[in-house]
Regions:
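Conserved beta-strand-loop-beta-strand hairpin that lines the nucleotide-binding pocket
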Residues: 1-6, 47-148
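Bergerat-fold GHKL ATPase/HATPase_c domain
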Residues: 1-41, 141-148
Length: 148
């Protein structure tokens, strides 16, 4: 699997594909099934927002790493109208479509980090991360590989 995969979002089938990419990467990185499902659900909600509000966009899924943890990064971009009131859009229960009803607040709750960058008339970028702590054996293997 490449370091970063981009999935164009223009139909429901594209969201399914993006979910699958996220789930596969989560599995490869050692995330639990529960966390893989949380990641896939967050991708689905963000993808539905793209379809509903912008009509199309893209989701980029990649891995990240720090000394003690590995992570998945999901960046969703669209060229839609932007979000006029981010605070309102991030309120629990605020919904404008027919997804799972989680929307942006639900996606934020499912992931460890969540950032929205939006500009009226120019679109929105949502960046989300989910982390998994590395165990000691993983850290030792990586240290040995980098020195050998």
């Amino acid at each position: 699997m490449p370091d970063e995969i981009r999935v164009s979002i223009a139909a429901d089938a594209d969201i399914v594909q993006a979910r699958g990419v996220g789930r596969a990467l989560a599995s490869r990185l050692g995330f639990s099934r529960t966390d893989a499902t949380l990641i896939a659900t967050a991708i689905s909600e963000i993808g539905r927002n793209i379809l509903l509000h912008a009509g199309s966009g893209e989701v980029e899924i990649s891995q990240d790493a720090e000394d003690h943890r590995v992570g998945i990064v999901v960046v969703a971009r669209d060229q839609g109208p932007g979000i006029a009131d981010v605070e309102r859009a991030m309120r629990e229960g605020y919904a404008t479509g027919n997804g799972l009803g989680l929307g942006l607040p639900g996606a934020r709750r499912l992931m460890d980090e969540f950032l929205i960058d939006t500009k009226i008339g120019h679109g929105t970028t949502v960046t989300m991360r989910k982390w998994r702590e590395r165990d000691e054996l993983e850290r030792l293997r990586e240290a040995a590989a980098s020195h050998g």
